[in-house]
Amino acid sequence: MGRGKIEIKRIENSSNRQVTYSKRRNGILKKAKEISVLCDARVSVIIFASSGKMHEFSSTSLVDILDQYHKLTGRRLLDAKHENLDNEINKVKKDNDNMQIELRHLKGEDITSLNHRELMILEDALENGLTSIRNKQNEVLRMMRKKTQSMEEEQDQLNCQLRQLEIATMNRNMGEIGEVFQQRENHDYQNHMPFAFRVQPMQPNLQERL
C-alpha cells in the first residue's frame, strides 16, 4: 500500500513543523552532497529556518559559485542594495572633493577661476570664520584672566596665612627669649646685692649667740 500524498501547505503545529523541517533539511543537504559527488557538480545550498538559524552546504567556495552565477546570468545578487551603497559612496566622495576644493579656496589657493559672486561668498565665509576665531580667542582670554585672577587671590591668601604664621612664631620666640633674659637679670641682681641684704636660708638663734 503506498503512502498518501501530503498536501503542501504550512504545518500549523509548531512541533510537527520543526520535525518536518529537520527531516526535509537533512534530506536536501544530503541530496546536494550526493549530486556534487556523483555528477561532479558545483552545488551550493543555503537554508534559513523560521527562527533565523542558517544551514548551508557548498561543494566549493561559495564566493566562486556566486562569481560564476554573476558571469553566466549577468545579474548580481542584491543589486538594489549594492546600487544604493554605490550611490552613497559616490555622494560621500563628491562631498569630500567639494570640501577639499573649499579648503583650498579658504587657504587662497586655486581662486583664479572664481567669478565675482564666488569670491564674495568666499570673502563672507572668511569674515565669518575670522569672527568665530576672534570670539573663541576672546573667550579663551577671558577664561585665562579669570583663572589667573583666581590663582592670584589664592596666592594672596596663602601669603597672608604664611605671614600670620611667621608673626605668631616670632611672637612666641620673643616671649621665650624675654623669659630667658628676665631670669638672667634676676640672677645677676641677686649676685650684686650686699651680703647683709641677701636672704639666708636659715637664721641662727640670736639667744644662742649671746
From Swiss-Prot:
**What is the annotated tissue distribution of the protein whose record heads this document?**
Petals.
Q: Where in the cell is it found?
A: Nucleus
**GO cellular component annotations of the record:** nucleus
Q: Which domain of life is it from?
A: Eukaryota
Q: Which UniProt keywords apply?
A: DNA-binding, Nucleus, Transcription, Transcription regulation
Swiss-Prot/TrEMBL GO biological process terms = positive regulation of transcription by RNA polymerase II
Q: Known Pfam families for this protein?
A: K-box, SRF-TF
Q: Where is the K-box domain?
A: 82-173
What residue stretches are annotated with the MADS-box domain? 3-57
- Database matches in InterPro entries: MADS-box/MEF2_TF, MEF2-like_N, TF_Kbox, TF_MADSbox, TF_MADSbox_sf
Q: Does the keyword Nucleus apply?
A: yes
Q: Which GO terms describe its molecular function?
A: DNA-binding transcription factor activity; protein dimerization activity; RNA polymerase II transcription regulatory region sequence-specific DNA binding
Q: Does the keyword Nucleus apply?
A: yes
* Protein role: Probable transcription factor.
Stated name of the protein: Floral homeotic protein FBP1
Q: Please report the organism this UniProt entry assigns to the protein.
A: Petunia hybrida (Petunia)
Q: Which gene encodes it?
A: FBP1
